[in-house]
Amino acid sequence: MKAAEIKRDLTNIQKSMSEINDLAKERITGGPGSISTTSASAITAPSTMSQTTTSRLAPKLTSAHPSIDDLRGLSRQDKITQLQKKIRASFENLVDHDDSNVIVTLPDDDDCPHNHFGSGLNLTHPTAAQLSASGLSGSSKTIDTIKFQEKSMKTESKTKVVTDGFSSEQATSNSAEMKRLQAGDIDYQESKGASAMRNRLEVDGVKTEENAAVIKEALSLRTGDITQQASNNVAASSITVQSENFSADKKAISQSQQSQTMTSNGIISQEKHVSSASQANYSMSHKGVSSTGSSMITSSSQMSAMNGQMLKLADLKLDDLKSLTAGSGQQEIEQTINKYSNMLTSIVSSLQEDERGGSAITVHDVGGKKSQYLEKINEVIRRAWAVPTHGHELGYSLCNSLRQSGGLDLLMKNCVKPDLQFSSAQLLEQCLTTENRKHVVDNGLDKVVNVACVCTKNSNMEHSRVGTGILEHLFKHSEGTCSDVIRLGGLDAVLFECRTSDLETLRHCASALANLSLYGGAENQEEMILRKVPMWLFPLAFHNDDNIKYYACLAIAVLVANKEIEAEVLKSGCLDLVEPFVTSHDPSAFARSNLAHAHGQSKHWLKRLVPVLSSNREEARNLAAFHFCMEAGIKREQGNTDIFREINAIEALKNVASCPNAIASKFAAQALRLIGETVPHKLSQQVPLWSVEDVQEWVKQIGFNDYIDKFNESQVDGDLLLKLNQDNLRADIGIGNGILLKRFERELQNLKRMADYSSKDTAKMHQFLSEIGTDYCTYTYAMLNAGIDKCALPHVNEDMLMTECGIHNSIHRLRILNAVKNLENSLPSSSEENMAKTLDVFVSYRRSNGSQLASLLKVHLQLRGFSVFIDVERLEAGKFDNGLLNSIRQAKNFVLVLTPDALHRCINDEDCKDWVHREIVAALNSNCNIIPIIDQQFDWPEVERLPEDMRSVAHFNGVNWIHDYQDACIDKLERFLRGEKNIDRIAAMVPGTPGSVSYQRMHSNDSDYQSGGAGAGSGAGTGGGGGGGVTGSVVDGLMVAANGSGQANHQANRYRQSPSPARQRGSTSQLSGYSRAPSKRSQILTPYRTQQAALLHKTGAGSASMQNMMPLAYLPPRRSSAAGLGHGSGSGMGSGYRSHSVDGLLDQAGSTPEQRIAAAAAKVTAGSTALTNASSTSTLQPEEEVTDAALNDSVTRRDKHTLSPPGNVQQHRKSRSLDHILSKQTLAELLPPSSELADGTQSMQNLAIPMTPQPQRRDTSSSSKSPTPERPPQPAMERVRERQSPEGVSATESEREDQPEECLRHGNQQRASASVHRGASLTSNKTSNSSLGSNFSAGGNNKTIFNRTMKKVRSLIKKP
């Protein structure tokens, strides 16, 4: 019963307070006459307490109450009195008169929605609510008394005087009111006053009127120790004068607002805003002519001050920044700028005072850290940049305020403090605007670059983002600054971060390289080339993220515009990615895709991009036009299109818009329309279809205005323009000046290159010529007019090209004919397996998620000297390019990138429709060295579910890719590529399918520069069977192998010694002529599988490389036929032996030099006899008495003995025997004539027959007829190193006891004969140490050793 009554009484109180709340919304209404009222009321609620429960009516400041303005309408005395009575009655009902000791409790929250008294009345200002939430206000005292007071007063007066010709009237009105509410230690007070005055005067037809009004408001809220005050003063006045022919009026209004927050210690914050406006109008008429005029003046000022730091930065809400939109007014933007600029100034001042030790409110006093305040400033600036449309203005203004207040200097000082380093770097990354960059460069560039490099070395991704972001901004200052940043390690830090997988970091890297390309100048662009920047741009341009891809393409487009480095840039392959990007993206949509370019670039940045619009490279112009189109849309929204006129970009855009380049002209025309400029006449790319007017427009664009009439008179259209020759231009057009004639021909050649001949070119002649080179596209129209098509192309000869097609350049004719032959040979044939392996690595990957890893592998391998092919063009559905298959056939190594689900589409793909499936099968069929790169997230599918033709790929040794340890992974991959592996593991590999071909990695030490294979035994074989080669070319093949190996050693050392790309290509031209159908991308230095430790110098007879040791002329490699390769395939045992190298013949331990020379002569004779017999019989079986101990023993590099390998293990290591370096004349002297020869074979005697002299290699320093040079001092022998595989040491070197001479002779015969058959095995797994050890033992003195040996051998033979 009592509970119900209490609940009812509380409900009545709530209703009463709700009525007060509604009444507060009504405005004051006045009555006639003079009214003066005063009222006061007090409400007291006694409290009843006991030892168990206390009834405390404690209003909470955090409840939702109406604001201060809602209490201004309490004016009607009767309603207020009535409500007061209701409240008093409600409180009286709470006390039980029968039992004064009753315990009164509040109902539970579940029973009554009214949690406390006064829930319907807001006792706080909104700002007070924020202070309450932060713990600054709020008293926990119990409210036992609520006091409400109200006072109001109104006065009015009016006076009027009227006489003849005169009238005067005056009226005044004053009002004042005050309201106050007290509840415990909460005191809210509101006061308001208003005054109005009006005067009217009329004399002899002239009327004047004056009005004035003043309103003053004041609010005050005290909660605990916090006091908030606010005031608002408004004054307005107007005056009017009017007569028959004249009238004038003037109006003025001013407003002043002020608010402050105070504590017992003083003022925390204070804000003041003052604004005023005035307007004057007049009109006058005289004799029917009237004139009017008006003027308006407005002014506004705002002041904000803070005494010390905000005690709770977490409560500093950024709602006004969040609420700003693209439609926000300018006044709102200015107020926000002023507010936060003052806040930044105050915080920076407090931090500076704290650093000096003189701050009254320090960070330690409030229990915070300095980094928190820096992070708060960072948040403010970050949100300012994010505001749509106005973010550029907001961000720039706040960054300027930070610099002007000394905050930028403070941040640079903090760069050397470990505890504040990162938070300062974060803020620096956000505020490096143009002016701030200049300040940093002038006052502390080294500190900022150092902290940026430190951040990039941190494993935390957030640190890397900040570091690369700072470097991105610093590269946008000047050429000198770019040089300094590069010198301090900024560019190296950016390039290292290109390896990461974090999107934000890669975006900073791409933008940083684009900025460096624009601002760096020619000198810094050379530095970029030396650091292989174009190669590192490839994985960025190949990325899936559009922002990363775009700025990487932009960087490469700027670099390629520099003619000095254009050739190096083209090698990276990035330029091929530009056109697909610009054709698949819309400039306006791309501008909105990322905040990084949502506000556009600065004027200086765009000015440096203007020259790219005039680049000769079509890709560079396409991307530059795309960017200006994007910038035009952004600047139009900002109302800043005049910037394009200031940087002189209008004329450049007009030139591009009228050029025949379809892509660039489209974007340039769109940019001009957005700017508001007229679009010039558009020329189609279909030049053969041009009209006479189009030709005249083109002539005008290239600057030959004086000859436009001549072209008009001759009615030259597009067809005739492409047929013009030098005689026509001189005689018919009248270009007599030779230099002008050259200029016109140059422009005409450029036009022919970019022209579109699709209307007439059904045979794809333009595409065929462009693959040879861009200069060859100029012959397209002439060859089409000559009637050359697919059928006639194979029958074209040199006379036809010169006479019918007008190709007077003999070198161009030769290259075209070679391209025709290569086009015929590119079709699959029976000899396709013998195609020259001119490509080092083919990278296969899944486009959906493997492009980044694949492109990263490409860069790493190219930096280590490998030529790499990666497909960047997306193939059409149902089409598999034959050129891609040919690239796989020409590749020595096939790197398979296995990212998550990379083989998912291959499952049950029996028809071989998947591209990755096709590439794997092509690599298996081509006997490529297949190396899987396995991502950590990749899981192998069940082998049984894979198609049978690719199952064996699951059993290959691979490299587990760990992104954080890239260098180690690449080192292991390089060892695989160069032929070092764990033989035992590979030999024990189980084929994927029983009975199928065993696809195992084939690692030989063939020179990478031999085109047709050094040895003839490179034919196809299946299973474990061996095979012989064409014996007629054995010695020639050995010579080529020795020559190529020496070239490899020499070039590999040059690559390691010199960073210059130009020097790295120094000696490739002589050998590249023997390659077949070279690819455009195969211009990078080819790596070498044989890696020597001894440095081979380029000059000097005593330090000649292996190719200089050749006594005969250089012989081009011979290509063996398929029949020759299959000969002797049934005798696989003969290929299981090694032949001694010259080191083994010269380095017998425990003997004198004379004894070693005598032994060498005996071995030469025995080996030559065995080789002759082997050539006749085509097979040689190993001796049966070989023990198991001999089978398991390993062979050392120096002491080579007669040890037979296991019969079931194929040996596939090419060893440099004495035959590699013996001349044919010397062999003829050593071997006696033999007449018993088998058909189809050649002995050493046959090989000694003098041959037709071959052209001498230019770098050969001696021949067989040259005198023997003097013997220089022999260097110390290097310690023999153990051969290691990626998994560790794969073979051990052990010392052996000397064998009897008879056994040694027999072993020599076996190994000598094995050299005939060793090249035929396709599945051999083991490699020999003799070829690797030969150059180590030589120690740069190989030629001297050879000459010494030959001299001693000849002297021994001639002795009786």
Curated annotation (Swiss-Prot):
> Region entry Disordered: which residue ranges?
27-52, 997-1026, 1046-1085, 1121-1148, 1192-1217, 1249-1343
Q: What's the protein here called?
A: NAD(+) hydrolase sarm1
| Family named by the database record | Belongs to the SARM1 family.
Q: What is known of its domains?
A: The TIR domain mediates NAD(+) hydrolase (NADase) activity. Self-association of TIR domains is required for NADase activity.
Q: Where is the composition biased (Gly residues)?
A: 1012-1026, 1125-1135
Q: Where in the cell is it found?
A: Cytoplasm; Cell projection, Axon
Give the disruption phenotype, in one or two sentences.
Severed axons in wild-type flies disappear completely within a week of injury, whereas axons of neurons homozygous for any one of the three loss-of-function alleles: l(3)896, l(3)4621, and l(3)4705 persist for several weeks after severing. After infection with Gram-negative bacteria, the respiratory epithelium displays an over-active immune response with a greater increase in expression of Drs compared to wild-type larvae.
Per the record, the major location class is cytoplasm
Q: Where is the composition biased (Low complexity)?
A: 34-48, 1321-1335
Keywords attached to this entry: Cell projection, Cytoplasm, Hydrolase, Immunity, Innate immunity, NAD, Repeat
Coiled-coil positions are none
Stretches assigned to the SAM domain = 690-754, 760-828
* Reaction it catalyzes: NAD(+) + H2O = ADP-D-ribose + nicotinamide + H(+); NAD(+) = cyclic ADP-beta-D-ribose + nicotinamide + H(+)
Which tissues carry this protein? Widely expressed in larval brains and adult brains.
Q: CDD domains of this UniProt entry?
A: SAM_SARM1-like_repeat1 (cd09501), SAM_SARM1-like_repeat2 (cd09502), SARM1_N (cd24153)
**Residues binding NAD(+):** R846, R847, E876
Q: What is this enzyme's EC?
A: 3.2.2.6
Described function:
NAD(+) hydrolase, which plays a key role in axonal degeneration following injury by regulating NAD(+) metabolism. Acts as a negative regulator of MYD88- and TRIF-dependent toll-like receptor signaling pathway by promoting Wallerian degeneration, an injury-induced form of programmed subcellular death which involves degeneration of an axon distal to the injury site.
In this chain, composition skew of type Polar residues spans 997-1010, 1046-1073
Tell me the ranges covered by the TIR domain, including all copies. Answer: 837-981
